[in-house]
Each structure stands twice: as C-alpha cells, then as structure tokens.
C-alpha cells in the first residue's frame, strides 16, 4: 500500500508518496502527489477519505505531482488501498496524457 504522510511544505498538508518504498532509504528526495479537499471531479483526481487516514473527503491531485526533500515528510497518517491503485494509474495517465 502506498503511504500517505503529512508533508511540511508551504504548510503542513497530506501527500501520497509515489516513490517506490524499495528505493526510499536510498533517496534524498521523494515524489509525492498533494491531497486536497478541493474536489473538482477531474480524471486526474483519486478520491480518498477517512478510511485512508484523511479527516475529510479529499482527492489526490495528480496534476500537481512534485518532488520534495525527504526531510519534509512528517508522520505517516494512512495509506492508499490496493483497490485504489488502478484509479491512481488512470489519474497519472490522464495527468501526463499517456496512452494506456
């Protein structure tokens, strides 16, 4: 399962870690997708909520994927479930206009 952490960026906000867990110990930076309560209904969003460890219904915003310093990651607060992985894949494909 992909972890959801609090990241200390412009302010503390939840993020979904996209970098593979296998390489995390060897990296100084990690790629994350921010999680926001602003739901636009876009194909680049993945719905998450309390079951994922997020306090409110929110979305993973794949239009705003960024790479941050690993030290900016705070505590793990939840996970994206395996059943949500196909939705994440589709959202990333849409965000980067990739063919399936």
Where are the model-predicted features located?
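Conserved functional hotspots at enzyme active or ligand-binding sites that engage polyanionic ligands
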Residues: 1-100
